[in-house]
Amino acid sequence: MSGRGKGAKAKGKAKSRSSRAGLQFPVGRVHRFLRKGNYANRVGAGAPVYLAAVLEYLAAEILELAGNAARDNKKTRIIPRHLQLAIRNDEELNKLLGGVTIAQGGVLPNIQAVLLPKKTGSKSSK
């Protein structure tokens, strides 16, 4: 007798909660951080899955835009400058990360309109 009861089946291979949810970010680690961080006495089973999905989405969004910024600068490696350009040129990300300073990020190029040279009028026809 195997000791599993009548209709119980063998467990099989362990499957992580991240792979069950189709995520790359670690659901188990996020759950541990939620428990250890004293955010609440109890943490539901769905909360770390949802939070890991949100974090993964934000990371993918920022990396996508930073990759585009790197390609625009003819570079193959993303540096902090590319992250800065990606975040500051995106309205929603800039609002979310408005108070964040990115080390070695630099500033956005910006010239006030009044400082630009005056445009010459079109040539008058005779």
Curated annotation (Swiss-Prot):
Biased composition (Basic residues): 1-18
SUPFAM superfamilies xrefs: Histone-fold
CDD domains tied to this protein: HFD_H2A
Protein location: Nucleus; Chromosome
Cross-link annotation Glycyl lysine isopeptide (Lys-Gly) (interchain with G-Cter in ubiquitin), location: 119
Positions of modified residues (Phosphoserine): 2
UniProt cross-references to PROSITE patterns, sorted A to Z: HISTONE_H2A
Region (Disordered): 1-21
InterPro entries attached to this UniProt entry: Histone-fold, Histone_H2A, Histone_H2A/H2B/H3, Histone_H2A_C, Histone_H2A_CS
Residues annotated with N-acetylserine modification: 2
Sequence similarity: Belongs to the histone H2A family.
UniProt name for this protein: Late histone H2A.3, gonadal
Organism this protein belongs to: Psammechinus miliaris (Green sea urchin)
